[in-house]
Amino acid sequence: MSAAKENPCRKFQANIFNKSKCQNCFKPRESHLLNDEDLTQAKPIYGGWLLLAPDGTDFDNPVHRSRKWQRRFFILYEHGLLRYALDEMPTTLPQGTINMNQCTDVVDGEARTGQKFSLCILTPDKEHFIRAETKEIISGWLEMLMVYPRTNKQNQKKKRKVEPPTPQEPGPAKMAVTSSSGGSSGSSSSIPSAEKVPTTKSTLWQEEMRAKDQPDGTSLSPAQSPSQSQPPAACTPREPGLESKEDESTISGDRVDGGRKVRVESGYFSLEKAKQDLRAEEQLPPLLSPPSPSTPHSRRSQVIEKFEALDIEKAEHMETNMLILTTPSSDTRQGRSERRAIPRKRDFASEAPTAPLSDACPLSPHRRAKSLDRRSTESSMTPDLLNFKKGWLTKQYEDGQWKKHWFVLADQSLRYYRDSVAEEAADLDGEINLSTCYDVTEYPVQRNYGFQIHTKEGEFTLSAMTSGIRRNWIQTIMKHVLPASAPDVTSSLPEGKNKSTSFETCSRSTEKQEAEPGEPDPEQKKSRARERRREGRSKTFDWAEFRPIQQALAQERASAVGSSDSGDPGCLEAEPGELERERARRREERRKRFGMLDTIDGPGMEDTALRMDIDRSPGLLGTPDLKTQNVHVEIEQRWHQVETTPLREEKQVPIAPLHLSLEDRSERLSTHELTSLLEKELEQSQKEASDLLEQNRLLQDQLRVALGREQSAREGYVLQATCERGFAAMEETHQKKIEDLQRQHQRELEKLREEKDRLLAEETAATISAIEAMKNAHREEMERELEKSQRSQISSINSDIEALRRQYLEELQSVQRELEVLSEQYSQKCLENAHLAQALEAERQALRQCQRENQELNAHNQELNNRLAAEITRLRTLLTGDGGGESTGLPLTQGKDAYELEVLLRVKESEIQYLKQEISSLKDELQTALRDKKYASDKYKDIYTELSIAKAKADCDISRLKEQLKAATEALGEKSPEGTTVSGYDIMKSKSNPDFLKKDRSCVTRQLRNIRSKSVIEQVSWDN
């Protein structure tokens, strides 16, 4: 044991000898911790929208009391965990979890929070505060949650009797026994796979056949252990596939079998057993249950009623779209379905506390509250969950503006406020009346995910943040506006609850002891069974036969609800047994009404004279029997027609357009009124028939008295002839009465048949006229749409062509303006070039003048140089010649001449230097002029190139625009203008310099070429 404590067994595997113990550690199932697989496989048993107080809220602090409560979707699972998330989608991760197995108490929180309809869930860790919108919702949650603290307190008291406490106590809805097929089947998970098999119709037939094989119910299964058997029920009999009240109570006794004391099982651990336990319960001795007939026909009728309830359950499950809360019979596990195969109906489910069901021994509310699986089916369709929703949506107004509002769906309207604070202050911004809503569709909008609410007043466009929110709103509004699929809030009354569940919860003895007129004898049933065996369908059944019965039950429930609503308030406090007896009485009256048409019943007549008299006139009574049979067939057909009439108008698809919906609705209403009138006439006819049958019975009594008189006459008291005359008169009167009754009945049948044909003809004519009107409207609408589309296409084409033409004209004008600007620039450039050419010519002339002056200066300089050289040579000769001859005589004269010559030489040298400087300056000026000339020629070339490129580009643009204009003109069907000049400006006709611009381009080029060649030649000559 110490090793087991150190290494706890994490996986429960059932022991083959005791399936409530683990084969590894031999500890009970509840001592094993729940793993993730158990949590994911757990079934939700209750759920709904509630308001949760934020964490850390201290309601003793006035500041915290003004905090906003968070709206969350709460789900209570069968393992005792209460989880809450942002929405009701099953894929949404929960924001938090409250372990109800550790809950110590659930108390009213209004005193602490100051909020109505609030609860406080006390756990050892913290306190959780929840709040609902209405009293019914919070009462339902209180009833569901109070089970856990009570159970936890009971477990504390029973610690001496049961196993040691476990690390995690399972919830009251957690099962205690697993794996109905053996130990290996439960080894894969803590919740056995055998329990995952859904309840099907085949299991009901197997239970019926098993009950037939063991009618006495005294033998026990050999595989059953004493610890697996259940204590006997206190008051109610055990039924296969039907949950009894004893399953909800706490079993706390010790059973001794064979001198061994068996471990006591708590009530919430014994909710589910294996098939062997079920067989043990079914095979308990009859003294444990009240005596009731166990004929095969009664068993068959019970199974048929179970199948009808199962069909209704599945049909209603298909109509609901709540994926989390719906736990239909197809999803219940097989371990539970063996004890309770058919959940209670959810026709009038609500969150209000349910009244005690009609049973043989009604249990206390404390014991009834422990039926968590019963609440799992009743809470799957609650009025508050379907007909109440809040959230942020965006509404589109008539001017196209979008505005965000806080929407609240309640009653027959969709109200919207500025925010939730405005809702609490009743500051209403607007309201959408849903009483006339007939459809809610998705609508594509530019903002988020849109949908439209279609009403007679108009269409309202809303948008949600996500597609999931939009889908939830559409489903909620559709269920809200369709009263057949959404349950009525008034059904939360105890009377409605009793009426909705009376067919399933009535005891077996009451149903078996009801008289069923017209029931076939055992020989007929045997022959039918033989026929089915010959046809290969010994265990099959035609389920289409149950639909009229099931619809009749639904009609009876609706009529019962209507009568209870119109009755006095004292009817609400009626006992369940009285309601069940009232329902059985109505069912019996209806059967009698049909049974009286089958057989003309009367007291047993042992008088041989009467039998002789009836045998003497078989022809008189044979025809009435045949006619009454025909009448019975006709009435059965009429009832079948009434029962199969669809009662849910919202499920019918309208075939007429919107403007015909009012007429069709009025026609449909008139049809239903006529149907109700016909039903009333039929009931009146049936009453008259019963009165006539009563008269017939009185006549038969008179006939019996007459026969008695005849017998007395034989004894000598009355003459025989008098008796014979009285008997003949009585027989004639009786025959006339029967004939009158038959004729009256035939007339009524003819009248009903004619009325039916007339109604069918009117309905057919109305349908045909509606279809024709719809076709005509559709045809006219199509023609209007085609004309509108053609007109829009033509107008769009014309507007496109006109816009294209305007665009072309604008482009053409812009190009013309650009050409004018370019021509002006070209003229200015030409003027500048002319001025530059003139300046260049002046510079050339100045250069030539300078060159001539330079040449003259060079010649003068040469002449001076020659003269200087000659003078120097002369002086030298004079000096040399005179020096030899006159050196002695003229020294002073020679010195003077030499001085003069030196001075003259210096003067000449200075002149030469001045001339050289002037020549160099002239050379510099010439080089400067040559550079200016080169710069001017280069600039002229660049300007000319730019103007040529601009002119070529302008020519290309003009040609392209001409082509585009021509194409546009051809597209418009107009004749293109020929020979028209697009550009009214000639680039060669410039006003600024007309003489210069009129020259040919070749002449200008030639002149420029000559000027360039001349300048080059001069430059070369100058350099040389």
Curated annotation (Swiss-Prot):
> Phosphoserine (modified residue): where?
193, 219, 221, 225, 227, 266, 270, 289, 292, 364, 492, 617, 799, 976, 992, 1013, 1015
Tell me the segments the record calls region Disordered: 152-262, 274-301, 328-379, 486-583, 972-995
Impact noted for substituting I919P: Loss of interaction with PPP1R12C and PPP1R12A
According to the record, the residues making up region (Interaction with F-actin) are 1-382
The record's tissue-specificity note reads: Expressed in Kidney, Brain, Heart and Lung.
Q: Which SUPFAM superfamilies does the protein's record reference?
A: PH domain-like
Which Gene3D superfamilies does this UniProt record tie to the protein?
Answer: Pleckstrin-homology domain (PH domain)/Phosphotyrosine-binding domain (PTB)
Q: Which residue windows are coiled coil?
A: 672-976
Q: Name one GO molecular function term.
A: actin binding
Q: Which residues carry this modification: Phosphothreonine?
A: T295, T645
Q: What is this protein called?
A: Myosin phosphatase Rho-interacting protein
* Species: Mus musculus
Q: What is the lineage of its organism?
A: Eukaryota, Metazoa, Chordata, Craniata, Vertebrata
